[in-house]
Amino acid sequence: MRVPLAAPLQVTATVAGLFAPRPVLGYVATESDATLRQILEYDTVAVVGCSTTPGKAAHDIPRYLVDHGYDVIPVNPFADEIFGRTAYDSLTDVPDEIDIVDVFRPSEEVPGILDEVLDRADVKALWLQLDIRDEDAAKRAREAGIEVVQDRCLKVEHQRLD
């Protein structure tokens, strides 16, 4: 359930267990904790931009998801395998059902990623990691019945709500 808010918020993010202010002008959080919990109940997460490099968020966060029981599908055209799992060139190439698409690519790439999401009939949620936002793409996804989370870390929210 979405809770409408009257004014922009100052959003905070947990980084290494500390709270750091992350003001985002004009951004109003629309994802309630109940909605986030519902999304986090899904099983299969395709990670667009999944990295082979330990120490990078695009590697360590998907690794965390694997370690916490999620079926992670790496999407990276420059890798054959990540975490012992087949890496796919694009969402279009993934033969398995996908519940969540977790994006670790620049905001400018979100519309193209969303096009691939909309070509599938199985994606229930589009999750854009910290500093990744695209209001037009989010609107298109929501109009198609897909939940959207922007500018939030899936790992941080999992830890906070678990």
Regions found by a protein language model. Give the residues of each.
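Structural motif
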Residues: 99-100, 125
